[in-house]
Amino acid sequence: MISPVLKKYARPSLWYRFCAWVASKKNRLYVGWFGVLMIPTLLTAATVFIIAFIAAPPVDIDGIREPVSGSLFYGNNIITGAVVPTSNAIGLHFYPIWEATSLDEWLYNGGPYQLIVCHFFIGICSYMGREWELSFRLGMRPWIAVAYSAPVAAASAVFIVYPLGQGSFSDGMPLGISGTFNFMIVFQAEHNILMHPFHMLGVAGVFGGSLFSAMHGSLVTSSLLRETTENESINVGYKFGQEEETYNIIAAHAYFGRLIFQYASFNNSRSLHFFLAVWPVVGIWFTALGVSTMAFNLNGFNFNQSVIDSQGRVINTWADIINRANLGMEVMHERNAHNFPLDLA
């Protein structure tokens, strides 16, 4: 007969079973301790975003009593709609629902934007931690989470760091298609981001990564080892988990080496895939770093009227054309918020 003491400890406690379930690798979807934080924050951000995108009233984004409509119920469509950033009247103040005198005031001042952005930021950081956690439990290396840190850094730059540097959440990127375009145009006007070296590295990372991905995929697809007849798809010959190579890396290496030159092609599959991961990740890191420095007005290069002839007359360059375009965009945005051509805020 089992004693009461042994019977008490024979069945694990509810907390112990919960901990085992959270950390279990046998779940269809891994939860993890970062997932315990990720799930409620991302669900909150997604729910509030959907509701606000559909039905939020106009927001006084500039703090001058001129509300901007962003939701579908107030005349927008999928392209023009957005969750409008928190009002400039709020600035960087923490603005939860209980800080407003009423729900209408909270909505008028753009409270949903701050709620979404803060929960979203915690959620994506938790997702990155969850990637590391699952990799650790499976005995894998941690580079999946490191790669994901690039989009996390980019989102943090436009939603958190830039508003902090500019002094108001109203300067954050709107949560919508046209709002994103407006953010990009105003960012160019105020910071000349196209002339910033870190943005150039980001462009090289994104477009270069796309090029390298397309090149790698097409080379592999073109050098598959056929395991089927001519009447069957070549893809049928692959069995998940097979030990044999699925493509001829020697043939792919030889083709690319002859197409360009010998040392342009990788002869090591591991170094090749490391390069494919590193190139876009480092580029996006630099872009995020550039946006974060421009948040504090360390802007792109300004070569305004830098080329002159022997008589001192200006010879216009494309840099001068860009500067003229920047001035045009600058004077047209927030045109009722200030009385000077340049934004003196």
Swiss-Prot record:
Q: Which reaction does it catalyse?
A: 2 a plastoquinone + 4 hnu + 2 H2O = 2 a plastoquinol + O2
Q: What is its main location?
A: plastid
Top-rank taxon: Eukaryota
Q: Which of this chain's residues are annotated to bind a quinone?
A: H216, S265, F266
Comment on bound cofactor: The D1/D2 heterodimer binds P680, chlorophylls that are the primary electron donor of PSII, and subsequent electron acceptors. It shares a non-heme iron and each subunit binds pheophytin, quinone, additional chlorophylls, carotenoids and lipids. D1 provides most of the ligands for the Mn4-Ca-O5 cluster of the oxygen-evolving complex (OEC). There is also a Cl(-1) ion associated with D1 and D2, which is required for oxygen evolution. The PSII complex binds additional chlorophylls, carotenoids and specific lipids.
Which of this chain's residues are annotated to bind [CaMn4O5] cluster?
D171, E190, H333, E334, D343, A345
Keyword Transmembrane assigned to the entry: answer is yes
Please tell me where Fe cation binds in this chain.
H216, H273
Query: What InterPro entries is this protein classified in?
Result: D1/D2, Photo_II_D1/D2_sf, Photo_RC_L/M, Photo_RC_L/M_CS, PSII_D1
Sequence positions that bind chlorophyll a PD1: H199
Which chain regions cross the lipid bilayer?
A: 30-47, 119-134, 143-157, 198-219, 275-289
- What keyword terms does UniProt attach to this protein? Calcium, Chlorophyll, Chloroplast, Chromophore, Electron transport, Herbicide resistance, Iron, Magnesium, Manganese, Membrane, Metal-binding, Oxidoreductase, Photosynthesis, Photosystem II, Plastid, Thylakoid, Transmembrane, Transmembrane helix, Transport
How does this protein sit in the membrane?
Answer: Multi-pass membrane protein
Q: What is its EC number?
A: 1.10.3.9
Briefly state the modifications made to the protein after translation. Tyr-162 forms a radical intermediate that is referred to as redox-active TyrZ, YZ or Y-Z.
The record's section on PROSITE patterns has: REACTION_CENTER
Q: Name one GO molecular function term.
A: oxidoreductase activity, acting on diphenols and related substances as donors, oxygen as acceptor
Q: Which residues bind pheophytin a?
A: Y127
Extra notes? 2 of the reaction center chlorophylls (ChlD1 and ChlD2) are entirely coordinated by water. Herbicides such as atrazine, BNT, diuron or ioxynil bind in the Q(B) binding site and block subsequent electron transfer.
User: Into which family does the record put it?
Assistant: Belongs to the reaction center PufL/M/PsbA/D family.
Q: Which HAMAP family match?
A: PSII_PsbA_D1 (MF_01379)
For this entry, the protein name equals Photosystem II protein D1
Phylogenetic lineage: Eukaryota, Discoba, Euglenozoa, Euglenida, Spirocuta
